């Protein structure tokens, strides 16, 4: 899928789920399930509850997302 089709949003980690999945609350109040992108996994970026993250979502399934950045 092309990068232009993705929707980027800011959110906060609510809870950690098994298999590097996370429950993320977006700025607009929606709660989605997100997984870590491959580059973050490769570089061992640690994500904890309460972290501010940037997620990208596809327009086809708005209940799932990919975490692409963790704010400092």
UniProtKB/Swiss-Prot annotation:
Record localization: Cytoplasm
Similarity-based family: Belongs to the IF-1 family.
TM helices/strands, residue ranges: none
Superkingdom of the source species: Bacteria
Segment forming the signal sequence: none
Residue intervals of the S1-like domain: 1-72
Keywords attached to this entry: Cytoplasm, Initiation factor, Protein biosynthesis, RNA-binding, rRNA-binding
Subunit (UniProt): Component of the 30S ribosomal translation pre-initiation complex which assembles on the 30S ribosome in the order IF-2 and IF-3, IF-1 and N-formylmethionyl-tRNA(fMet); mRNA recruitment can occur at any time during PIC assembly.
Gene Ontology MF terms: ribosome binding; rRNA binding; translation initiation factor activity
ATP-binding found in the keyword field: no
Alphabetized Gene3D superfamilies for the sequence: Nucleic acid-binding proteins
InterPro entries registered for this protein in UniProt: NA-bd_OB-fold, RNA-binding_domain_S1_IF1, S1_domain, TIF_IF1
GO cellular component, one term: cytosol
HAMAP family (alphabetical): IF_1
Pfam families in UniProt: eIF-1a (PF01176)
The name this protein goes by in its record: Translation initiation factor IF-1
Presence of keyword Protein biosynthesis: yes
Functional note: One of the essential components for the initiation of protein synthesis. Stabilizes the binding of IF-2 and IF-3 on the 30S subunit to which N-formylmethionyl-tRNA(fMet) subsequently binds. Helps modulate mRNA selection, yielding the 30S pre-initiation complex (PIC). Upon addition of the 50S ribosomal subunit IF-1, IF-2 and IF-3 are released leaving the mature 70S translation initiation complex.
Disulfide bonds: none
């Amino acid at each position: 899928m092309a990068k232009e089709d993705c929707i980027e949003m800011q959110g906060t980690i609510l809870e950690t789920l098994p298999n590097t999945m996370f429950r993320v609350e977006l700025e607009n109040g929606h709660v989605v399930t997100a997984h870590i992108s491959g580059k973050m996994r490769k570089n061992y970026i640690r994500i904890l509850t309460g972290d501010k993250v940037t997620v990208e979502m596809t327009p086809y399934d708005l209940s799932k997302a990919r975490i692409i950045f963790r704010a400092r």
